Amino acid sequence: MAFSTSDEKRIAELLGMSPATLSVRVFGVDLPHDPIPWDSDDEGDDTMPTGSWSERALGVETVARPHVYIGPVGIGAVDDETSDWDSPASPPVTGAERAAGGLPRQAPLLVRRVSGNEWRVVSESERRIEEIGRELARICEIQWDEDVAGAPVGTVTGNSPWSPVRGSLLPPKSGSPTYWNPPPPSPSDDTTCEIPSLPSSLVSSPVNPAPMYSPVSDAPLNTPSPNMMITPTHPGLARLLDTPPTPLDADLGDWAVDWLYAPQLGDQLRIESGSSPGKRPLDDPDEVPSSKRGPSRRALLN
């Protein structure tokens, strides 16, 4: 797909990048999920089948890097007529609304590759990111919908094990538009990737101090390690978990916006007391209420 200079400048502006040496390719990808722990009966023995859920994303690659993905647009692959919405086969997506065909619709994210295996979810509001995605789709003349997510129907391999964290971009197919399919996995390929280190900005964010949670399991990510293994799934996977996982000691701020899980503190803040409403319980049973005390020492001195 050929872009005019004005289109490239506009895309650079949308993505907050310099248009000086910008050259743009647009493609569609599937961001698959690995098996998702799903405890439907509180015994911890349920696991969703690999690839039963996938996120289709509109991707934009620039020669100046980083790779940028707008997605997911639609998520899920279940028949609403035959599947129980609350069953492990079709878990609810928090904050999502149903789109055409019964699929849940999740707000898109803007994910940017900083370097190597280091990815960043751009700190933008969901409304702003969706606007960016729609305008990119308009520039690229592709439909922004749950049925087409950045690529013509049939050009993206469903349930592909390819991951943008682990994989590498292939040259675009010959001809126009320049869409491409993810490469097939090698026989030894597995579902994890090794991250050399966490971002240097692993600090609490005063702007969004909500605790951080593991997107895949109850295991906390409290101990950054050079050998730390993570699942190469989209951060939005956190929304598929039924039970809030264990919080981290520190949050990653805007490095993983969609992993932030704000706990509901209402019940935890309720104080049980045997006293009647509006009356302050006495700290000491023998203490006399101030209204029944005699004059204070200061009053006697005066």
UniProtKB/Swiss-Prot annotation:
Region described as Disordered: 81-100, 155-209, 269-302
Low complexity bias spans: 196-209
Protein name: Uncharacterized protein ORF3
Source taxonomy: Viruses, Duplodnaviria, Heunggongvirae, Peploviricota, Herviviricetes
